[in-house]
C-alpha cells in the first residue's frame, strides 16, 4: 500500500492493452479456471449495482473526466535516505511543530511508552490523510505521499501506506496537474482533493511522509545545518505561492530526532549526489532533480519570525525532552507489551529494551513457553499464500539508537507460521531480514519462504545501502532455497508522479543490477518489483521476472459484497492480460480490508452516508475473506494478504472521518485475533508453497 488517494482506473495502460477498444475480458479466456469468485451477479464498477451477468468483469467504459485544479509548478525538494517516515517527528513549526507533535504523542499514544509512542509521529500534511499509514518501509509503514489528482472513478483515497510517494512530494497549498485526462491510469501526486479534511499525509503501504503547517513562522536555511542527507533530518521548502510553509527544525532529545519536511519532489530515483544544489520550482525536475537544494532567502521581517522560532524551539525541546525522557532507557516498540498472560511472559514488560528482553527471556525458540502458547492458536488457519510483513522498530536510523527486538520478531513469526508459508519483506535496513531468518531457525520452521524486499528511495544513499545489504544477505546465506525471490521497490512508479518514465528506467536498472549479481553468484532467484495494478506496462513486464500488483478494493470504494469479484477482475484486466504470450507469473502483492474506521467511496470519506461505498469493519473484513480466501486457495490465485498485525502508531494518520490507518491487521498489535473476526478454515485445505 502506498500513499493517499490511490485510485483505480479502467482506462488503458501505457501499452493500450486495457483500453476499452482493445482490451478483452481475460476472464472469458484461459483465466476462467483461476477466478476465486463463485458464479453470481456481476457488479457494475461505476455505479456499484449488480447485474445478471455473473461476477466476472468490470465494464469496459471506465474512462471518466477527472477534475483538476490550478497548476503551480512543483518544487524540487530534498530526499531523505532515512527509512521513510519513522525518522521524522513532525512539521517544523513554532507551536504547531515539534511541540504540537509532542503533545499529540502524549494525548493519542497514551497506551504506548517511550520510542514506541513516538513511532509514526513523523508529521502532518494539512488536509491529506495517509493511505495505509505506513511511513516506513514495508507493510509496517504507510509510504505516504501527496495524493493523486481528484477523480470520479474508483479511487483509493489513501494509498496503502507501504507504498506512497517519497518524503515530501508536494508543496503545501498547491495542486498541480501534469497528466492528460486521457490517461487516468497515471497517478498525479500533486493535487489536493482533501481540502479541509484535516488529514495527515504520509506514505503504506510505504512506505515517506510529507508535512505542512498553516502558520510556520520562520525560514531556515538548511545549508547552515550539517546534514549528509542520510540522518533523517530533512529540510523542507519555503513556498512563496502558498500561505502555508514548511520548515525543517532538527532537534534531539534522548536520542530521538524530530524533523519536519516536505521531501523530494525532485527525484524518486535519479537524484544527484548530495553535493548538487538545485532547488526551486523547476518544471519536469522529477526524478532528475538534485537530492539537496538551496532555499530561497528569508523574506523581510524574518527577525520577528526568528524570535518566534527560538521561543517555540525552547518549548519544543522541553516537551519533547519530557516525552523522550521515558525512552532514554531504550524502550522499543514491543508488541508483547499488551499480550495476555496466556501468551506472554515477563517479556511483556512495557519498559524492556531488546537487550532486556533477551536477558530476561533468553533467545526465544520453539521450546519456550511463550512461543508454545503463540503457536497453539486454534483460530488461526494456514490459508494465505503469502502475508506482507515488516518487523516492529526497523526504521533507519532510529534503529541504530533503539535496536529492534529479535524476540519480538520470533514471536511474530510464531504467529505467522500458522497463517502462511510465505512472508514478504519490504526492506533490508536494521537487520530485519537477518532477524526473520534467525526466528525461522529458532522455531525450526521447515516450510517457510521469504520474498526479500529492497526499499528504493529518492536518495541514492538509501537505495545503495538497501541493495548492498541485500547482496550481503544473499552472499552470507548458507542456503538460498529459503528465498522465493527479491522485490526491488514497492510502488516506486506511483511515487514518481509525473516522472513515471524516468522512474521506470531507473527502477529497471536497479532490477537488472540485482539480476546480474545473482547470476554472478550462481543464484537462481526471480527479481521483481511491486506497484499499483495499473502502473504496469509491457516494458516493466519484460524487465521483471514476476508481475506483482497491489490491488485494494477498499480504496476503490467497492462495496464489500462486490470486492472479491472486483479485485480479481481488476487484476486480470490490468496485469494478467499483460503477460499473455509470456511465461511470466502474476501475483497480487497486496490485498486486504480494514476492520474499522469509516467508509470510502472511491475518493475518500466523502460518502453520502455511513453505509455507502467500502465500509471498514470486522463484519466486512469477514465478508471479504469469506468471498476471497478459500476461492483463491482452491483456484491457485497467488496473493499476499495485507496484513497480519495492527499498527497502533499509525493512528496519527487518521482523520475525523478516516480512522482506518491503524486497523488493517487480522490481529491487534498484541497478536490477539480481533473480536468477532473469523479466518476461514477452507475445509481444512491449507496454503502450500
Curated annotation (Swiss-Prot):
- Broad class of the protein's primary localization: membrane
Its UniProt entry gives the catalysed reaction(s) as:
Hydrolysis of (1->3)-beta-D-glucosidic linkages in (1->3)-beta-D-glucans
Q: What is its EC number?
A: 3.2.1.39
Low complexity: bias regions: 341-360
Keyword terms, alphabetized: Carbohydrate metabolism, Cell membrane, Cell wall biogenesis/degradation, Glycoprotein, Hydrolase, Membrane, Polysaccharide degradation, Signal-anchor, Transmembrane, Transmembrane helix
Q: Where is the composition biased (Polar residues)?
A: 175-188
Q: Does the keyword Heme apply?
A: no
Q: Which residue intervals are topologically Cytoplasmic?
A: 1-307
GO CC entries: cell surface; extracellular region; fungal-type cell wall; plasma membrane
Q: Which InterPro entries match?
A: Beta-glucan_modifiers, Glycoside_hydrolase_SF
Active site at which residues? 491 (proton donor), 590 (nucleophile)
The GO molecular function terms of this record are: glucan endo-1,3-beta-D-glucosidase activity
Transmembrane residue ranges: 308-328
- Which residues point to the Extracellular side? 329-689
Record has Transport as a keyword = no
Topological type in the membrane: Single-pass type II membrane protein
Q: Where is this region: Disordered?
A: 1-91, 128-147, 169-195, 334-365
What role does it play? Answer: Glucanases play a role in cell expansion during growth, in cell-cell fusion during mating, and in spore release during sporulation. This enzyme may be involved in beta-glucan degradation. Active on laminarin and lichenan.
Which family does the record claim for this protein? Belongs to the glycosyl hydrolase 17 family.
Protein name (database record): Probable glucan endo-1,3-beta-glucosidase btgC
- Native species: Neosartorya fischeri (strain ATCC 1020 / DSM 3700 / CBS 544.65 / FGSC A1164 / JCM 1740 / NRRL 181 / WB 181) (Aspergillus fischerianus)
Taxonomic path = Eukaryota, Fungi, Dikarya, Ascomycota, Pezizomycotina
